[in-house]
Amino acid sequence: MKIAVSSYSFSQAMHDGRMNILDVIPKAKELGYDGVEIVRGNQSDREMRVLAALLKVQSEEAGVPIIAYMVGADFIKNGLEAEVARLKGEAEIAALMGAPRMRHDSSAGKDAQGNSVSFEDALPVIAEGYRQVTEFAAGLGVKTMIENHGYFMQDARRVKKLIETVDHPNFGWLVDMGNFMCADEVSVESVRIAAPLAVHAHAKDFHYKAAGEYVPGQGWFSTRGGNRLRGAIVGHGVVNVPECLKILKAAGYEGWLSVEFEGIEDCIMALRADIENLREITAGM
């Protein structure tokens, strides 16, 4: 199994000035990763298009493919028509950098006035947005996908329902095995639901504290149900990563596995440990 790393995993080094986005591909290669994901930053559209062309050249010269482009979105808050138009531009950027996949978000579940919207009311709008974007992206050779993250669209049954509603061959699931815990689900059980629809996968691990337990130090955040999680090196937390990978493989998944690290350890040290652990886990698969 080919293992990639998300540029998001280097956030710590980017924030403290050790790295910038153009350092991601060389550093990923140095650490032994086979590919990279590029997460959209705060660049303007014009700047991002220039950067995409630079990253494509860098990727080709290094022999480290850009396997996916990740962007935010909110069809409810930002409006369907405007968000579809913007995301079509993002699909063009994905094609410019040579990324065959693009993940974009759905919604945080609030309208432009900050009022909560139910999943049932939001679903038709979100599904229509994904359908229009993926139809456009298909013409560029870019497959689009939704990731289970962001609380509102994080639990397995909601994501499955969305994919079934969109019902397009160019659209599928970026299965993040750790993120199910943010919706208080058991990762192994949720991956069983997700695996048949997987077009991409994230390896992510978390430390866990139940609601009411003492939570020491920094780095912890609340799940939807009030439990606490902290990002972990793969194999150090409570996510059964080997079993999740077995389930994906049994369902016929043969795609990339990408590391998304968000712990408090030094990110370079952690990413070195992540790939060592994943090579060991996947060696017999």
Regions found by a protein language model. Name each.
Residues 5, 28, 36, 59, ...:
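Conserved, mostly hydrophobic/aromatic
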Residues 6-20, 72-84, 116-122, 233-235:
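Active-site mouth loops of central-metabolism enzymes
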Residues 21-41, 98:
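Catalytic domains of carbohydrate-active enzymes, especially glycoside hydrolases
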Residues 26, 54, 58-65, 77-173, ...:
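Active-site acidic/histidine proton-transfer and metal-coordination neighborhood
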Residues 268-285:
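C-terminal helical cap(s) of enzyme catalytic domains, especially alpha/beta-barrels
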